[in-house]
Amino acid sequence: MNSIQCRILVFLVLLTSCFSPVCGKDKKPRQAIEKLSIDGPYLLKADDGSMRAISVDGKGRLLDKHYKSIPTTFSFEVFSDNGERLFPVTIHSVSRPKWKDVQPEKTFVLSDPHANWSCFASLLKAGKVIDADYNWIFGANQLVIIGDVFDRGVDVLPIYWLIYKLEKEAEDAGGKVTFLIGNHETMVLGNDLRYTKKKYTQLADTLGMTYPELWQKSELGHWLKTRNSIQVVGDNLFVHAGLSKEFLDRNYDIPTVNEIVSDGLFLTKKERNADKGSDLSFMFATYGRSGIGVWYVAQISIIR
């Protein structure tokens, strides 16, 4: 190597050493892959009778099991976000409940649990609706939950699965569990995720689908699509946030309202408003112009 080549090589080494720290400082670090949080299970049923069970365990591992057919007594365990084993659930048949019930001796009513597992479970235990193991002990009485399980908290699935489980246990005991659609059900399933915790959208992203798509294909999604928005129990009418004068002026019957809301549950805001004059658009109108009134109500706990 001659002297000219040597000087050029030294110059390049010095040039590299001078610029490397600057480039490294300006370059954005590669974002680390975040561990998934405990969630699920989401049971995705296919038309051919097969099923896919998706969940995340306590170590953040994605569990994705496929079943060629669904066993008649298929059951699974439900865990809270902090890893506590809560209760087992057995799948049962799902259909739309009647919109009108006879008044039982007692009716326990609450609303807006917003994925707060400890609060929701504590209320039901204090009201003698469930025992320490989350089993139905309310006899032939009725539990009414007026919507809004989604958003704000981290235990959406445990609350929905408990309601689903209690529905069958109450029926077997001569009682009833009623879950009504609230505005946060319509928001999340319509892909308005502004109040949805990151753990849920992160799981959907990992699976290559949107969060509403994950629900639409699931057992709980099918169950939600068959829930009513208005329910009459004896002389009491229950709805998430009241009924507007405009709604009353339209003289809808309750079964029609329940069907319209269910039909639009998994549609986006744009799809719901495609025909501005339609019943569908009216039912999903926002606060201040609301037809059915599925917006804004505080959590309550009432025993009648």
Write out the residue ranges for each language-model feature.
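Bacterial Sec-dependent N-terminal signal peptides
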Residues: M1-K27
